[in-house]
């Protein structure tokens, strides 16, 4: 399975979290619970700022 991992910054609390680019479930911030990514059937829709691509495949 090809996909990338991204470091996403939460817009509410500035926590940074690594998220799979093709997430198949909703990803919430581990600190405040804000939604960081939602699945779309392909590449996830990110709701926070993508700080960097941690690992590209």
Swiss-Prot record:
<keyword id="KW-0687">Ribonucleoprotein</keyword>
<dbReference type="GO" id="GO:0005840">
    <property type="term" value="C:ribosome"/>
</dbReference>
<comment type="similarity">
    <text>Belongs to the eukaryotic ribosomal protein eS27 family.</text>
</comment>
<feature type="binding site">
    <location>
        <position position="29"/>
    </location>
    <ligand>
        <name>Zn(2+)</name>
    </ligand>
</feature>
<dbReference type="GO" id="GO:0006412">
    <property type="term" value="P:translation"/>
</dbReference>
<keyword id="KW-0689">Ribosomal protein</keyword>
<feature type="zinc finger region" description="C4-type">
    <location>
        <begin position="10"/>
        <end position="32"/>
    </location>
</feature>
<feature type="binding site">
    <location>
        <position position="13"/>
    </location>
    <ligand>
        <name>Zn(2+)</name>
    </ligand>
</feature>
<feature type="binding site">
    <location>
        <position position="10"/>
    </location>
    <ligand>
        <name>Zn(2+)</name>
    </ligand>
</feature>
<dbReference type="GO" id="GO:0008270">
    <property type="term" value="F:zinc ion binding"/>
</dbReference>
<dbReference type="GO" id="GO:1990904">
    <property type="term" value="C:ribonucleoprotein complex"/>
</dbReference>
<dbReference type="InterPro" id="IPR023407">
    <property type="entry name" value="Ribosomal_eS27_Zn-bd_dom_sf"/>
</dbReference>
<protein>
    <recommendedName>
        <fullName>Small ribosomal subunit protein eS27</fullName>
    </recommendedName>
</protein>
<dbReference type="InterPro" id="IPR011332">
    <property type="entry name" value="Ribosomal_zn-bd"/>
</dbReference>
<keyword id="KW-0862">Zinc</keyword>
<feature type="binding site">
    <location>
        <position position="32"/>
    </location>
    <ligand>
        <name>Zn(2+)</name>
    </ligand>
</feature>
<keyword id="KW-0863">Zinc-finger</keyword>
<dbReference type="GO" id="GO:0003735">
    <property type="term" value="F:structural constituent of ribosome"/>
</dbReference>
<dbReference type="Pfam" id="PF01667">
    <property type="entry name" value="Ribosomal_S27e"/>
</dbReference>
<comment type="subunit">
    <text>Part of the 30S ribosomal subunit.</text>
</comment>
<dbReference type="InterPro" id="IPR000592">
    <property type="entry name" value="Ribosomal_eS27"/>
</dbReference>
<keyword id="KW-0479">Metal-binding</keyword>
């Amino acid at each position: 399975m090809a996909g990338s991992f991204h470091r996403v910054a939460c817009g509410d609390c500035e926590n940074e979290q690594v998220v799979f680019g093709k997430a198949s479930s909703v990803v919430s911030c581990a600190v405040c619970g804000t939604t960081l990514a939602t699945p779309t059937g392909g590449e996830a829709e990110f709701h926070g700022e993508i700080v960097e691509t941690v690992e590209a495949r």
